[in-house]
Each structure stands twice: as structure tokens, then as C-alpha cells.
């Protein structure tokens, strides 16, 4: 598709879709809680729909009623063996978390994904789940999908130190631990997003978080809840950056989730000189509205414990850095290389093809700015965040056209992205 270029100031108010991480977990925990769970504000992107379909195939009744998702949970004993392969589409979250959940079930399943997911390593969940007594395997020593899993009703608790910073691996182990008899401990390298821990507690589960150590004694039963999903900060990040780098812009991003394990991008842009104001902050619910205006920015260093708190926002932060004065250095982000694409290389290649000055490193990027961006032929390579980054970059282009292939990938997390973009350009 041909992207909009040479945009004037962006003006208006936007409500971004529901948080993807919370939406997945609401469905997963609701499916094994006892009773009727209702979810408002659920993200209806393709990844979450993959999770919903998986649980329907596992015998859980899930319906939409009055703009809410209603899940008839039957407890951990209520799942039934699927009659077919579970297709997780493009969703690594679905595959890893559901594998953890099914670890304690007395049946076997085969889990597959699309071409992109089939290139993402699952060894990170295979090894701890095997230690708990699950028969699970993928392709080659990296354990690529498809995954074959035989659950075990007599799971063993483990103490596991994560070799990488991954909320998905942590979550897979905790979901298995809810069904294991005894004390499971997970020790993180760096603190990652904690939605699973918070939502297990919201559903009546018990665990202890002590710094980087999470302790859970199983088995436990969960109780149905009413969940309201906040706006996704990872989706809001695209408008946040657009407002900061397009001259004359002023945007209000409504009801954005600001869980502290996800707000690294806000800290980074403020350090770079961004003018942002928080309105209607609800600290208990961890939700706020964010007013953003065009700002003159300077380069910065992004590394260490900050990386897990903004890992999904790094592509759009890289674009931001191309418009900042000076050098921005991103380090310790090698996890980007095993996302939907090798995001370090793909971001570097796309933005450099548009005139940016970026050097890819083993674990990040060195970005020199500011640079003028020009038209180019690009692709999402099947990665939703790459597609949205490119669409925001195109708004800065004054010379040439920007063509984007495989734009349908954006449906993964933000089905109304282009509709919202057009509205902000016309408000």
C-alpha cells in the first residue's frame, strides 16, 4: 500500500485498543477460573483471537455479549483434549503461555503457528517445563514450532533462574506452577512486565514477589472476575512518537495503561526532552491520559534494566532517535533479534533506506540524528510493529513515496491503526 507522507501537524484525541498482554492473560486465566469471567475493553486483534480460539478448541465456552467477552470457566479440571491442532497464528504469547497452562493437563496437544512464529525459538519454555515433568518438544535444538506436548497431572515444582529476561517464559512457568504440588520459584535477570503475577492475584491466586524472585505454592484454584482492560501503551507509543516528531502536533492519548513494568518509553522520551503531561491519573488502576506536543529532543543511552520495560517500543524509539539531536545508543536488546522479525536488522535496514543513519550492533543500534527521511519501498516482513513504525516514519517524508508491503500484519495488535491515522491527520 502507499502510505501517507508529508503530514501536517497531527491534532486530536485517541483511544488506543486494549492492552494485548492483559487481554491474553484475561482470556487464559478466565478459561481456568471457576465461574463467569467478563472482560471489557478486550483487544480484538488477531493474536488475542488466536488465544480465544485455542480455548474454544479446549472446550471452554466463550461468547461476546454487550461489548464484553464472557468466559465460562470450569477450573483447571474443566479443559478437554482438543480434536484438532491448536493454531497460534502469529502469537508467541499464545503459544508460550498456553503451553505452560497445558503442562498440567492429562492429554496431548500439537501447537502450530504461522511462518513467522515457526521461526521463533521455544527452547526457553521447553527446558523448564521438561524439568516440571512435561513431555514437550519442537524442531531442532532451538525447539522451533510446531510443539508437541503431553501434559502431566503430577507436575513437579522447580526453582528456575531465567537465562533471559522474558515475561513469557516467567508466565509459562507460573501457569504450570498453579497446577504443581509444592513451591515453585522463578528468579529473573531483570524485572519484566508483571501482568501475569498481578492477574493471578486478581483471580484469587496467591504468590509472593520479592524483588526478582517470584514464589508460588500450588496447586491453586482461581475464581472468575470482571476485568477492564486499559489502553495498550505499546500501541499508544506510535502516537506518542508521532506527536513528538511532527512539527506543530498536539495529541491526547486516552486511558493508557501505565503499569510501571511497561513505562520505560515514558522515562526515555522525558529524558530526551519530550513535553508530555499526564491527565486523570488513576494510580490504583494504573491508567492515565497522556497529552503530547511536538518537542525538540536530544539523544540518549537506553540499556540494562530499562530494556525489558520497553522491549516492544524499541522500533518506534529508533525512529524517534532519527529526529533527535545527537547520538542515541540502544544496548542489551539482543532479544529483539528473535521477535516476529530480527527487529534490530529490519529497523536498521528500513530506516536507513529512508535516509536515517543507524548502525546495527549485536545487541542494539547506534542512531545519529537528526536526519531527513525520504521515500522508499518497504515491507512489514509480517511484523505489526515494523509496519506501524514505517507508517509513522512516512509522515515525515517530504520527497518521494513510501510503499509498504504485507500491511495486513498490523491487524495483529491494532486493527484500526490506519483509520485512526487518517482521523488524526484531518482533525
From Swiss-Prot:
EC number(s) reported in the record: 2.5.1.19
Role according to the record: Catalyzes the transfer of the enolpyruvyl moiety of phosphoenolpyruvate (PEP) to the 5-hydroxyl of shikimate-3-phosphate (S3P) to produce enolpyruvyl shikimate-3-phosphate and inorganic phosphate.
Gene that encodes it: aroA
Gene3D superfamilies, per the entry: Enolpyruvate transferase domain (3.65.10.10)
Species for this entry: Streptococcus pyogenes serotype M28 (strain MGAS6180)
Compartment list: Cytoplasm
HAMAP family per record: EPSP_synth
Pathway as given in its UniProt record: Metabolic intermediate biosynthesis; chorismate biosynthesis; chorismate from D-erythrose 4-phosphate and phosphoenolpyruvate: step 6/7
Protein name per its UniProtKB record: 3-phosphoshikimate 1-carboxyvinyltransferase
